[in-house]
UniProtKB/Swiss-Prot annotation:
It comes from Treponema pallidum (strain Nichols). Coiled coil: none annotated. This protein binds specifically to 23S rRNA; its binding is stimulated by other ribosomal proteins, e.g. L4, L17, and L20. It is important during the early stages of 50S assembly. It makes multiple contacts with different domains of the 23S rRNA in the assembled 50S subunit and ribosome. GO terms for molecular function: rRNA binding; structural constituent of ribosome. This is Large ribosomal subunit protein uL22. Pfam families: Ribosomal_L22 (PF00237). SUPFAM superfamilies: Ribosomal protein L22. The keyword Isomerase does not apply. Belongs to the universal ribosomal protein uL22 family. Disulfide bonds: none annotated. PROSITE patterns: RIBOSOMAL_L22. PANTHER family: CHLOROPLAST 50S RIBOSOMAL PROTEIN L22-RELATED, LARGE RIBOSOMAL SUBUNIT PROTEIN UL22M. GO terms for biological process: translation. Keywords: Ribonucleoprotein, Ribosomal protein, RNA-binding, rRNA-binding.
Length: 124
């Protein structure tokens, strides 16, 4: 059994909370690339825009490496949203006090592969 070739793209240090981006990633995980991009285009979240950029990069990497591929044959195999570093900012409060506000960052990794169809039309 031959192993399928995967293509990936990774973006680091995006200023977005991983807990807010993960639900968007779960919507498009394990879907065909074209359908996933259409879904992301209709979502109003900031995370949808960020994931869309990384998915375009992964598809571009795949097409650059293998010229016979096109976007209709790509499949989103995995999306990982990892936690990045946190920026600590001072938030001034009343009576001379201050609170620490954490600006969270995330790393997004998208893995795409070629979708293989069997003779009966189902995915294999």
């Amino acid at each position: 059994m031959t192993e399928r070739v995967t293509y990936r793209a990774k973006t680091k240090f995006l200023v977005a909370s991983p807990t807010k981006v993960r639900p968007v990633a779960n919507v498009v995980k394990c879907k065909p690339y074209v359908r996933a991009m259409a879904l992301l285009g209709h979502l109003p979240h900031k995370g949808a825009r960020l994931i869309s950029k990384v998915m375009k990069s992964a598809a571009s990497n795949a097409i650059d490496r293998d010229k016979r591929l096109d976007e209709e044959r790509l499949f989103v195999r995995d999306i990982q949203i990892d936690e990045g570093p946190r920026l600590k900012r001072l938030w001034c409060r009343g009576r001379g006090r201050g609170d620490v506000q954490l600006k969270r960052m995330c790393h997004i990794t998208v893995v795409v592969e070629e979708s293989v169809r069997t003779k009966d039309g189902s995915k294999g």
